């Protein structure tokens, strides 16, 4: 894991114990093939909770004009699997993932779900080793660009702003997942022949998150 050590130290001034760091990169398919080897699922569980809390608190403090629904949509955009996996890809973390043979052949190191879980596991590892303050700083460093993008959406509702930019009638497709008592809504919208996704606890939140994703892409291209 020497490459990961160097990456964390160079970009985040962060060091982790070798054993804990390795565990953060062990997918369950690898541990299944290698006996009692511990995988990263518990760290991912913890990291997911830390990520959600840090982003929620940051948005609450810095976006006083946002309603509860807008806060939820912004958080959904930032912590979505797609967004977190994108950050992991930019850091080239997939190459360090320890996967089982089958998962590796299936291209696991490039899968959105596995990359998102990996980054959340890394957040969990920082939490375990160094506590909440260090984990918070790590999260804010990871998602800082996406937080900046969200801050630029405050003048207009993201769906309205996207409509103005594209000057087209946008159609949002929404699907639901999960049991009735715990529904998750996933929305998608096509802009310039590319599909953007978002999710939330309501149709509106999911649509706003999808609009935020599209806006972020459009504004990155124009900058």
Swiss-Prot record:
Acyltransferase found in the keyword field: no
Cited InterPro entries: dsRBD_dom (IPR014720), RNase_III (IPR011907), RNase_III_dom (IPR000999), RNase_III_sf (IPR036389)
GO biological processes: mRNA processing; regulation of gene expression; rRNA processing; tRNA processing
UniProt domain RNase III: residue ranges: 1-131
Domain of life: Bacteria
The EC number(s) this enzyme carries: 3.1.26.3
UniProt-annotated binding residues for Mg(2+): 44, 117, 120
Catalytic reaction annotation: Endonucleolytic cleavage to 5'-phosphomonoester
Keyword vocabulary terms for this entry: Cytoplasm, Endonuclease, Hydrolase, Magnesium, Metal-binding, mRNA processing, Nuclease, RNA-binding, rRNA processing, rRNA-binding, tRNA processing
Membership in a protein family: Belongs to the ribonuclease III family.
HAMAP family for this protein: RNase_III
Subunit architecture: Homodimer.
Function, as annotated: Digests double-stranded RNA. Involved in the processing of primary rRNA transcript to yield the immediate precursors to the large and small rRNAs (23S and 16S). Processes some mRNAs, and tRNAs when they are encoded in the rRNA operon. Processes pre-crRNA and tracrRNA of type II CRISPR loci if present in the organism.
Protein name per Swiss-Prot or TrEMBL: Ribonuclease 3
Organism expressing this protein natively: Tropheryma whipplei (strain Twist)
The organism's taxonomic lineage, starting at the top: Bacteria, Bacillati, Actinomycetota, Actinomycetes, Micrococcales
């Amino acid at each position: 894991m020497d490459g990961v050590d160097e990456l964390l130290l160079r970009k985040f001034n962060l060091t982790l114990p070798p054993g804990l760091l390795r565990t953060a990169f062990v997918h369950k398919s690898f541990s299944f093939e290698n006996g009692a080897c511990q995988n990263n699922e518990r760290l991912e569980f913890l990291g997911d909770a830390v990520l959600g809390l840090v982003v929620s608190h940051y948005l609450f403090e810095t976006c006083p004009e946002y309603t509860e629904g807008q806060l939820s949509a912004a958080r959904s955009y930032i912590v979505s699997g797609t967004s977190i996996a994108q950050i992991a890809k930019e850091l080239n973390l997939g190459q360090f993932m320890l996967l089982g043979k089958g998962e590796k052949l299936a291209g696991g190191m490039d899968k959105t779900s596995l990359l998102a879980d990996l980054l959340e596991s890394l957040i969990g590892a920082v939490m375990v080793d160094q506590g909440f303050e260090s984990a918070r700083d790590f999260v804010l460093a990871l998602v800082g660009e996406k937080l900046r993008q969200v801050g630029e959406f405050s003048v207009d509702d993201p769906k309205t702003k996207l409509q103005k930019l594209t000057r087209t009638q946008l159609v949002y497709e929404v699907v639901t997942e999960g049991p009735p008592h715990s529904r998750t809504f996933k929305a998608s919208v096509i802009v310039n022949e590319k599909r953007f996704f978002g999710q939330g606890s309501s149709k509106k939140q999911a649509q706003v998150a999808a609009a935020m994703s599209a806006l972020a892409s459009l504004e990155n291209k124009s900058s």
